Curated annotation (Swiss-Prot):
GO terms for biological process: piRNA processing; RNA methylation; siRNA processing. InterPro entries: Hen1, SAM-dependent_MTases_sf. This is Small RNA 2'-O-methyltransferase. S-adenosyl-L-methionine binds at D78, S114. Belongs to the methyltransferase superfamily. HEN1 family. Its EC number is 2.1.1.386. Keywords: Cytoplasm, Magnesium, Metal-binding, Methyltransferase, RNA-binding, RNA-mediated gene silencing, S-adenosyl-L-methionine, Transferase. It catalyses: small RNA 3'-end nucleotide + S-adenosyl-L-methionine = small RNA 3'-end 2'-O-methylnucleotide + S-adenosyl-L-homocysteine + H(+). GO terms for cellular component: cytoplasm; nucleus; P granule. Binds 1 Mg(2+) ion per subunit. GO terms for molecular function: metal ion binding; O-methyltransferase activity; RNA binding; RNA methyltransferase activity; small RNA 2'-O-methyltransferase activity. Its cofactor is Mg(2+). It comes from Rattus norvegicus (Rat). Methyltransferase that adds a 2'-O-methyl group at the 3'-end of piRNAs, a class of 24 to 30 nucleotide RNAs that are generated by a Dicer-independent mechanism and are primarily derived from transposons and other repeated sequence elements. This probably protects the 3'-end of piRNAs from uridylation activity and subsequent degradation. Stabilization of piRNAs is essential for gametogenesis.
Length: 394
């Protein structure tokens, strides 16, 4: 829950001793986190594929956005090249993202440059965010900003946040919230500017904010005011021939690509690993069944109604339809000391089916990593393989 409360200045350090009779505002969660969460909620709802953060600074927002599976291109632009160099590492893939890769490719790039310069590599984006950016622009740059962002880049959606000057009297000794701010607008000033921009470039705009004022001060509005611009018609317009000409004025400072299941090497690695786990589970179960048969001195089929259902070996819960597909597929079998698991059987297990739904495709991906039967229809392993992995013991 978002809250704002008055805290005595003496609780916040020596910097405020001269105004200790005053109160200051503390937001929970912190205001910057509320702004980032607002963007994350938009991404959840609209699932953009291409997202750019103008004035990305320390790249904290980009780091939060890179986890979203819908995003395939994530770009940050900032005028401070040193910040980009020092924070690029935040966006590198973690080890876990190689072990459990994304479904879709993701490329992350940081550019050094001004947000009022045109660069054709930012054309065709679904979402552009400008979080606490415009108040840092001087009057000339502010005048150029709408034409570049809304006119030239023309994304499907733009989010702009900026301080609400009407909230400032609630802070002790505050005129502008940052020494680099060139201005801070009231709600009327921001909404007038934003509405004019929207009308000029064929957008609609809605106003909201984050940072709820403390009780008794509701009349000042949110601490941070936000405009959400959506392109009328809901579709991205095709760049014109002149726009499509390469205009690369930004300097690429950092770029990285994430492993994904769209990359054949990655898909093969994950598929083979999951397949070997499933094969070993079935092999171990068959060994137990043979031991039980020896004890009872009577032959039994590989699977009976009284034995544990094969789908339970996966350590997961399945729908009735999934169980039926597994149980109705070709059964594993033995020939001497060799254990055969049909590919059609393996394809019925949801984890493997998600990775590969086609028998021919699975065969081509695993052929040089596992032993296949002479006709290529089954994986073949030694029944009494000494592999130490025991997934059912976990």
């Amino acid at each position: 829950m978002e809250t704002a409360e008055n805290i005595p200045c003496s609780m916040l350090g020596d910097n405020f001793k001269e105004v200790c009779a005053e109160k200051v505002i503390r937001f929970r969660p912190p205001l910057y986190k509320q702004r980032y969460q607002f963007v994350r909620d938009l991404v959840d709802r609209h699932e953009p594929k291409k997202v750019a953060d103008l004035g990305c600074g320390d790249t904290k927002l980009l780091k939060l956005l890179k986890i979203y599976p819908c995003i395939q291109l994530l770009v940050g632009v900032d005028i401070n090249e040193e910040k980009l160099h020092s924070n690029g590492h935040r966006l590198s893939p973690y080890l876990g993202e190689f072990v459990k890769p994304r479904d879709l490719d993701l490329t992350v790039t940081l550019y050094h440059g001004s947000v009022v310069e045109r660069d054709s590599r930012l054309l065709g984006f679904d979402l552009i965010t400008c979080i606490e950016l415009i108040e840092h622009l001087d009057s000339d740059d502010l005048a150029r900003f709408p034409e570049v962002v809304f006119g030239y880049l023309s994304p499907a959606m733009v989010v702009i946040s900026t301080p609400n000057a009407e909230f400032n009297p609630l802070f002790p000794t505050v005129t502008l919230r940052d020494a680099d701010h060139k201005f801070e607008w009231s709600r009327m000033e921001f909404q007038t500017w934003a509405s004019q921009v929207a009308n000029c470039y064929n957008y609609c705009v809605e106003f909201t904010g984050v940072g709820t004022p403390p009780a008794g001060s509701e009349h000042v509005g949110y601490c941070t005011q936000i405009g959400v611009f959506r392109k009328n018609g809901g579709k991205l317009s095709e760049p014109s021939a002149s726009q499509q000409r390469d205009q690369h004025v930004y300097k690429a400072v950092y770029t990285t690509s994430y492993p994904s299941l769209q990359q054949e090497k990655v898909l093969k690695f994950v598929l083979v690993g999951e397949l070997l786990i499933q094969v070993d589970r079935l092999r171990l179960r068959h060994q137990r069944m043979l031991r039980e048969q020896e004890k009872e001195r009577g032959p039994k089929p590989w699977y009976t109604d009284s034995s544990p259902a094969p789908h339970l070996l996966l350590g997961a819960v399945f729908t009735e339809a999934e169980k039926a597909r597994i149980e109705n597929s070709p059964k594993p079998f033995c020939e001497g000391e060799k254990f055969y698991i049909p590919l059609q059987r393996l394809l019925t297990y949801p984890k493997l089916h998600r990775l590969c739904a086609d028998e021919d495709r699975m065969r081509s991906l695993i052929a040089d990593s596992v032993c296949l039967s002479s006709d290529g229809s089954a994986v073949v392993v030694d029944l009494h393989n000494s592999w130490d992995y025991r997934p059912e013991d976990n």
